[in-house]
Design a protein with these regions (language model features):
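Secreted/extracellular ectodomain signature
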Residues: 1-180
Length: 180
């Protein structure tokens, strides 16, 4: 499997650069924090658009589920498999964040504001294994589920070999790191 260099994806540094290591779905907290960072610099501080670049790294835990499209959330009953709150099961998983208030903290909206997202391939494979076991997918091999998950990544999400390496790569490009 070939993985891209993240440098061109991140683009030229901005005045402010923040990396968010997101490990859990956690009510969409990681995506909400990214939105808050954009709002703080662009609106509250009045610096305007383009002064902040963010990178969200979805790795380990359950956060990898945020990278998948709505059809995949439904097909694999991800909210149920993750035992998310009952209200999350009823919510629309708008662009990968079942807890987003509208679409202001969705991956689609954040990428439009200049965010880059990286999904850990190791986490995709681990998540495929967990889904297969949790949902009793005895006729669906783990490798096939992992391939389907990789194919279901949202636009703006780039697959990387390992999230922990992506975090280091982003920090080497002078992004401050925030664990969410």
């Amino acid at each position: 499997m070939n993985f891209p260099d993240i440098g061109p994806i991140l683009g030229a540094p901005a005045r402010h650069n923040q990396a968010f290591g997101i490990r859990t779905v956690s009510d969409g907290e990681g995506l909400t924090q990214m939105r808050n960072a954009f709002d703080a610099y662009e609106i509250a501080r009045g610096e305007g658009p383009g002064t902040l670049r963010t990178a969200g790294v979805l790795y380990g835990g359950t956060s990898i589920a945020l990278a998948f499209d709505d059809a995949t959330w439904r097909a694999y009953r991800i909210a149920e498999a993750l035992k998310l709150r009952a209200d999350a099961v009823a919510l629309d998983t708008t662009h990968g964040n079942p807890f987003a208030r509208g679409t202001d903290a969705s991956i689609a909206t954040l990428t439009a504001r200049g965010a880059a997202f990286f999904a850990c391939n190791n986490a995709v494979e681990g998540f495929a294994k967990s889904l297969t076991a949790e949902l009793g997918l005895v006729h669906d091999p783990i490798a096939r589920v992992a391939d389907r998950l990789r194919a279901a990544l949202l636009p703006g999400v780039t697959l990387v070999p390992a999230g922990v390496a992506a975090i280091n790569d982003v920090q080497e490009r002078h992004y401050t790191y925030i664990a969410v």
